[in-house]
Swiss-Prot record:
Keywords: Hydrolase. Its EC number is 3.6.1.41. It catalyses: P(1),P(4)-bis(5'-adenosyl) tetraphosphate + H2O = 2 ADP + 2 H(+). The lineage of its organism: Bacteria, Pseudomonadati, Pseudomonadota, Gammaproteobacteria, Pseudomonadales. This is Bis(5'-nucleosyl)-tetraphosphatase, symmetrical. The gene is apaH. It comes from the Bacteria. Hydrolyzes diadenosine 5',5'''-P1,P4-tetraphosphate to yield ADP.
Amino acid sequence: MAVYATGDLQGCLEPLKCLLDRVAFEPGRDRLWLTGDLVNRGPQSLETLRFIHGMRDSVTTVLGNHDLHLLAVAHDIERLKKSDTLREILEAPDRDLLLDWLRWQKLLHHDGERGIVLVHAGIPPQWSLKKALRLAAEVEEALRDDSRLPQFLDGMYGNDPLRWNGRLRGTARLRAITNYFTRMRFCTADGTLDLKSKEGLGSAPSGFTPWFSHPRRKTRGQKILFGHWAALEGHCDEPGVIALDTGCVWGGALTLLNLDTGEYHRCACDGAKGDAG
């Protein structure tokens, strides 16, 4: 058995198939980890979601901001944006099956045996892994509860609060947790977010640092796999932290990492036009 991890697919199915064929991936024997953002902006969002769902017993995925956006649009909370490529999913006969599976996925995955954490955007420096898992579970519970789901989806949009406070309650609390796990790039040592800057390491606003670079980050010593930040092009220069989003949907490449051997495989992508997010 081999375990592989790959970055944001965003509806780019053919590069994933290329990589899985290259390593002779066999569902049922091997496992595939995904950093989230399975859909949107790419040309095959429906086909990608169906493909992943079809081998769901061999897949571990976390949710990204585009996956959550899909759920919000599907529940008539949010409208489709011009750059969205989600309409085929919304009109598909199996949409309910696919979307119900999607909302049961995690925000944060920890493989204790391997000592590896999987997340879409990152873990803020002021949270320990134990605390991060506990807070992720709060959002996961809201997503899986039919009575709470619409309120959560309606409240998750927005940047405030930009800083975590344990006294936060209700919608603001869940929004803050969601933004850390699915939208974060730069923050201060106390976790204050900058949610506007989307470029590389050199574009940090004054006083802000990439979330993984803070010297006192409480998850130091943990191996963390993350996506979301295509502008890093797979390079974050931080021991134990691995950036897997190499900008497939923007014409970069899709990267597949063998977690057992450390070997990387890449497949070039045609890409789609738009703004990173």
